[in-house]
Design a protein with these regions (language model features):
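Extracytoplasmic/secreted cell-surface and envelope-processing proteins
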Residues: 76, 121, 168-169, 198-201
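Surface cap/lid and interfacial helix-loop subdomains adjacent to catalytic sites
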Residues: 141-151, 175-209
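Proline/glycine-enriched tight loop/beta-turn segments at coil->beta junctions
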Residues: 57-63
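Gly/Ala-rich beta-loop-alpha elbow adjacent to hydrolase catalytic centers
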Residues: 161-165, 169
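Short, well-ordered amphipathic alpha-helices
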Residues: 96, 168-177
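Short alpha-helical segments and helix-capping/turn motifs at coil-helix boundaries
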Residues: 33-54, 92-98
Length: 209
């Protein structure tokens, strides 16, 4: 893709108004299974395997994985409304199959839907993009809190994420895991597709090794 074509693409998905929290989509209720992209008890693309030689263990694994999916929202609103009839949801299903399915024989998979920020947010030079990402983070934090309180049952857990999900995972680890009682159950973070500056290990999650 040439620079000109990419700039045209960004122009096409640029929201036409500033971010306004009062006009944001309703926040998801994570006690409702419909607001999860993946759960151990519900069949979905997270249980995809390449062929019949692979086995799947959907639940009763000794470890959980909390997965934050990448950006799949390329539209002119700042945040997705999580409508399962829109293309963003189809992209989420694709990444469940080609990313988090890697854990489907070893971990119980939990992946929240969230009001992800539009891809344009990463290129916005004003405060709108950051505000959209902040809104997305509030969903991830609430989903994680619900997961810990209602689904995890004190098991060890992994954080897995990609792209926008990885960026939000950095913040989640800082706000909810680093230097908390959860740290002793936290096995590792597999967060790819977004840079992790070396200074983060001292400033953002200093107690995570």
């Amino acid at each position: 893709m040439t620079d000109d074509i990419f700039l045209k693409f960004l122009e096409y998905i640029q929201p036409e108004t500033d971010f306004d929290i009062s006009k944001s989509p309703p926040k998801p209720d994570y006690s409702d299974d419909a607001n999860w992209a993946a759960l151990p008890a519900i069949d979905g693309q997270q249980f995809y395997v390449p062929d019949a030689s692979f086995s799947v263990m959907k639940s009763d694994n000794p470890v959980d994985v909390f997965y934050i999916h990448p950006t799949g929202f390329y539209e002119k609103e700042w945040n997705s409304n999580m409508d399962k009839k829109r293309s963003a949801y189809e992209r989420t299903e694709i990444v469940l199959a080609n990313q988090i399915s890697a854990f489907n024989n070893s971990c119980n998979i939990y992946a929240p839907e969230y009001r992800q920020a539009t891809y344009y947010s990463f290129f916005d030079i004003n405060k709108n993009g950051q505000q959209a990402l902040d809104l997305a983070y509030t969903d991830i934090e609430r989903a994680f809190d619900y997961f810990i309180e209602n689904q995890n049952s004190n098991k060890p857990f992994i954080i897995a994420a990609h792209s926008q999900g990885a960026l939000l995972a950095h913040r989640l680890i800082n706000q909810r895991i680093d230097n908390s009682n959860l740290q002793k159950r936290f096995i590792c973070a597999y967060v790819i597709g977004y840079m992790i500056p070396e200074k983060y290990y001292k400033e953002i999650f200093p107690n995570i090794k």
